């Protein structure tokens, strides 16, 4: 049993040595070139890069899927102005192909002519750009609650694109995208349909079909179809002024909405047999409101889609106690006048107080300026003495 166990252990050691990273490095071929696969949008530019670690004094070469040599080192081999040299060194050969077409798709080969010849493949994938989608199926305006079916189609995509629907910001769930190969055998035509019931809110809405494809790189490519929906009218009555009072002029506006817009309006008052005649377009006019005008009024708005009747209850209030504008102006003017009079009174009071305080000085100066100045001085002294000396009054002549 010892010999078989030893043999098994030896085999495991050999297997580990062969698959160890060190063993892999020992078997690496430094003269083997390497490349990478590339994806390019039709009409774009692709760069093919080939590199080698040990060139063994040999040049790198690029050839197309038809095995036509494009570049050998820095030397152009195929006369195609779309193909240009990017880098040429002993360790790298890079070329670019501009204005790439679907026919350029395939495997490109990088070769190095050592012994033996070594090659590396680069798969170039060309994306076909989908055309702007086309919406069909909408012929004329729809009636409310009708069912609409729209079709969308886009061709030229590779790989096949995907179509989505939306109405405004709302996503519509259409049928799965149908795929059909184009006659060129390389691109595809995709189509989808959507069916939905229309409402009055859909009037004027845009139904959008968008194509999603990696070649667009997030750019929007869509088509919209605006739809028109016919629906029965609605109406509401708006009073002007909002709170009518007795003696005022009142207009009751009947505001109709619909598609088409109502063109005929008929006014009635409950309890009154004949239709009301005092109208202006869609408004009912009351030149001078009376209490007898109170009641419930109806407005019937009519279009070729039907009719709608709105009601309004009118309660005529007593005349407004609010003063007229002229009375308001008079009150303002009266207030200004009263304020001015008040200021004048204040000024007169201050002026009188000032004159009383300075009356003695004024009389003294006036007396000194007259011919009886000595007598005036005597009088002043007597007056001062009378205040300080009690009942004894003496005269002094200056």
From Swiss-Prot:
It is found in: Cell membrane; Cell junction. Pfam families: C2-set_2, Ig_3, V-set. Disulfide bonds join 50-110, 152-209, 254-299. Residues 1-24 form the signal peptide. One of its GO terms (cellular component) is cell-cell junction. Glycans are attached at residue 290. Residues 130-228, 233-315 form the Ig-like C2-type domain. Its main location: membrane. GO terms for molecular function: protein homodimerization activity. The chain crosses the membrane at residues 331-351. It comes from the Eukaryota. It is a single-pass type I membrane protein. Residues 25-126 form the Ig-like V-type domain. Keywords: Calcium, Cell adhesion, Cell junction, Cell membrane, Charcot-Marie-Tooth disease, Disease variant, Disulfide bond, Glycoprotein, Immunoglobulin domain, Membrane, Neurodegeneration, Neuropathy, Phosphoprotein, Repeat, Signal, Transmembrane, Transmembrane helix. PROSITE patterns: IG_LIKE. It is linked to Charcot-Marie-Tooth disease, axonal, type 2FF: A dominant axonal form of Charcot-Marie-Tooth disease, a disorder of the peripheral nervous system, characterized by progressive weakness and atrophy, initially of the peroneal muscles and later of the distal muscles of the arms. Charcot-Marie-Tooth disease is classified in two main groups on the basis of electrophysiologic properties and histopathology: primary peripheral demyelinating neuropathies (designated CMT1 when they are dominantly inherited) and primary peripheral axonal neuropathies (CMT2). Belongs to the nectin family. This is Cell adhesion molecule 3.
